[in-house]
């Protein structure tokens, strides 16, 4: 068999040009495999996309005047399922309109019952192995969704801001240390000031105490090698509950971890009364004013800072102390690293191996819990009488009335990471799983190499001791003609279905493949779509011309007599077989745009502009050349159309009907053309 699993589109809206590129490539691979006689299986489906979909549903509810917080979990999930049914259905219909020849009866959704059980089973198995644990740790926090998010869901933006220098008085002395910060509001949670142990300026102060301004808390001056004496003033305020580097220092020095923010990033009761309840940025302004009024503002500098934003919430994240579920990744990655290094799994283009290895070699424990409603609820129950008693299973405890389930859901990627086997009802042993797993090729974007690709490889080896796929093809990034990434938010991404109406679906498919070289970004251009449309017209006209000039005495299946062939005939047959050979070579290397160019060049230049012109004069003659020419045209067309079919399925299937002979099948299941090496003539080619 030849198997592909679709990277399931999120049920958050409509398909984009990126989806068109990705799914056209998959369709090319699956149609070719099917015509080669393989049992081709392409599993379609959609992803619940936890945080992305929940954000959309909340916005939809707000437009109706409904606040999420006024709904019960069950009521909110009803709205989310309605959203899924609407947009999931639209996406599937759009994939069909694109021409995707999926096994539609095998369609899956990452929250359908069987798949959900598989997701929860993966959690239980890893928990029982000691690879999943709950910890109170610093996480990336989105104040909009009020949830932890992963490093990969944080977008860093350069922001023009300020660097404020505050004077921190040393207790009992008429001296102070100057610390710099871009986030003054976090000073409310400071636990220490750190200096380098070898910094001669401050050695005498190590062990002394700071009177923390505005707060009145006494905090120590500590020595730590992390501090760079040449950066800034050489003094660093330490806020272990609100900064990852400070968190590590806090652990080393057993400092107090003081969280001064609520889940929405407003200031909490651990701060002085006047700041409680203020938004973090309002508190920042107030703190700067108060520091200045106390004569403790040393100076302010303009500063360009890289700030992490929540990808979905589009607000600056906070580093936030929170109880979360984590997965120990170091214990899982070795087989996945070895598989790619050994070539058991191949990346196309190969340069992505370096990126993959770097991430895997520096992997951290994965925060897999999210404080959301839409998703797979974590299969952990706490006893109502004793919260330290846990029950972990897919179905829950028998006396469930005495237990309360964890309210958090799993990170979306902790469900889609089992996709290649979950779609075949893993962990149940079954014929489908044995037949179609491992899959052959994964087609995906390089932007989710960590989110998804690496994690699927990990699960394949962890749960089945098999690679989940043999080849990974990373698609190009689509950019506009100025080099900006195509994006709906930027307004530079056309609606693909408007383009289908304007140019035709086949023309868009062929045009986008012409402009998508392996390993390079794609400069999207409507001119290429024009080329695609003109090419479809050229092919259509050539086929119509040939079909209209069938000789009256033509016999179906008549072979070409080598002796009767003239030089132009031998030349076009040689060019045809060379084109088939080159096309197959490019396809085997995953060079889809080069394969498209081979077909374009042969059909437009050799066949249409050259041989068809000769055919025009021969078709109006009464000698044997008319029959020979028609036979050669038929042989060319009956090999051209199958080669072109994976790229342009609609027009080729229609044209195939013009030239069908007895016992012919539909083009989609017709045999793949075979190269006749003996027909390739180096001398005349």
Label for each model-derived stretch:
Residues 1-198, 239-252, 256-271, 280, ...:
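N-terminal, positively charged nucleic-acid-binding surface of large information/translation enzymes
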Residues 157, 238-241, 281, 318, ...:
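Conserved phosphate-binding loops in nucleotide/dinucleotide-binding enzymes
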Residues 217-222, 407-437, 605, 609-612:
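Active-site-adjacent "gating/activation" loops or surface patches in catalytic cores
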Residues 18, 45-48, 76-81, 105-116, ...:
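Conserved short loop/turn motifs at secondary-structure junctions
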């Amino acid at each position: 068999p030849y198997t592909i699993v679709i990277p399931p589109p999120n049920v958050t809206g409509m398909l984009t040009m990126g989806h068109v590129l990705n799914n056209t490539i998959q369709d090319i691979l699956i149609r070719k495999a099917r015509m080669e006689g393989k049992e081709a299986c392409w599993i379609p489906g959609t992803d619940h996309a936890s945080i992305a979909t929940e954000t959309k549903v909340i916005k939809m509810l707000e437009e109706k005047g409904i606040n999420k917080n006024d709904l019960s979990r069950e009521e909110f999930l009803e709205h989310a399922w309605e959203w899924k049914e609407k947009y999931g259905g639209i996406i599937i219909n759009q994939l069909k309109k694109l021409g995707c020849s999926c096994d539609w009866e095998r369609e899956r959704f990452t929250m359908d019952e069987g798949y959900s059980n598989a997701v929860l089973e993966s959690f239980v198995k890893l928990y029982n192995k000691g690879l999943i644990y709950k910890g109170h740790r610093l996480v990336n926090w989105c104040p909009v969704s009020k949830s932890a998010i992963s490093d990969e869901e944080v977008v860093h933006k350069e922001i023009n801001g300020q660097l404020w220098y505050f004077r921190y008085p040393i207790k009992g002395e008429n001296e102070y240390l100057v610390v710099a910060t871009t986030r003054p509001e976090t000073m409310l949670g400071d636990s220490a000031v750190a200096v380098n142990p070898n910094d001669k300026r401050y050695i005498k102060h190590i062990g002394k105490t700071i009177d923390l301004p505005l707060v009145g808390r006494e905090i120590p001056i500590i020595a730590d090698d992390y501090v760079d004496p040449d950066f800034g003033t050489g003094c660093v305020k330490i806020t272990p509950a609100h900064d990852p580097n400070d968190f590590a220092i806090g652990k080393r020095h057993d400092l107090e971890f003081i969280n001064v923010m609520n889940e929405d990033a407003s200031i909490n009761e651990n701060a002085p009364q006047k700041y409680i309840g203020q938004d973090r940025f309002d508190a920042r302004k107030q703190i700067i004013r108060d520091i200045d009024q106390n004569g403790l503002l040393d100076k302010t500098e303009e500063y360009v800072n890289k700030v992490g934003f929540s990808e979905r919430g589009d607000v600056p994240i906070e580093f936030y102390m929170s109880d979360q579920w984590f997965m120990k990744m170091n214990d899982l990655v070795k087989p996945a690293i070895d598989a790619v290094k050994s070539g058991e799994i191949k990346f196309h283009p190969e340069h992505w191996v370096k990126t993959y290895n770097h991430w895997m070699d520096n992997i951290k424990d994965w925060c897999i819990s999210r404080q959301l409603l839409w998703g797979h609820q974590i299969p952990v129950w706490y006893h109502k009488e004793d919260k330290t008693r846990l029950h972990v299973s897919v179905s829950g405890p028998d006396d469930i009335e005495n237990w309360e389930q964890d309210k958090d859901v799993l990170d979306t990627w902790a469900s889609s990471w089992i996709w290649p086997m979950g779609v075949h009802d893993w962990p149940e042993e079954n014929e489908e799983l044995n037949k179609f797993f491992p899959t052959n090729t994964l087609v995906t974007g390089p932007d989710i190499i960590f989110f998804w690709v690496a994690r699927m490889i990990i699960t394949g080896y962890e749960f089945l001791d098999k690679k989940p796929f043999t080849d990974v093809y990373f698609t190009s990034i689509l950019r506009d003609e100025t080099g900006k990434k195509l994006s709906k938010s930027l307004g530079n991404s056309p609606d693909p279905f408007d383009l289908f109406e304007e140019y035709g679906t086949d023309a868009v498919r062929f045009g986008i493949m012409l402009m998508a070289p392996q390993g390079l970004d794609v400069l999207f251009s409507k001119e290429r779509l024009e080329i695609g449309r003109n090419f479809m017209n050229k092919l259509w006209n050539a086929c119509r011309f040939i079909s209209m000039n069938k000789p009256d005495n033509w016999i179906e299946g008549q072979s070409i007599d080598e002796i009767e062939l003239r030089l132009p005939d031998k030349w076009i047959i040689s060019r045809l077989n060379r084109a088939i050979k080159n096309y197959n070579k490019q396809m085997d290397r995953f060079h889809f745009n080069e394969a498209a160019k081979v077909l374009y060049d042969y059909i437009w230049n050799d066949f249409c502009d050259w041989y068809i012109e000769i055919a025009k004069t021969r078709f109006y003659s009464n000698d044997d050349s008319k029959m020979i020419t028609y036979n050669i045209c038929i042989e060319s067309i009956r090999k051209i159309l199958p080669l072109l079919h994976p790229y342009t399925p609609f027009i080729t299937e229609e044209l195939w009907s013009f030239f069908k002979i007895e016992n012919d099948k539909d083009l989609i299941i017709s045999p793949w053309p075979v190269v006749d090496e003996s027909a390739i003539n180096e001398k005349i080619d």
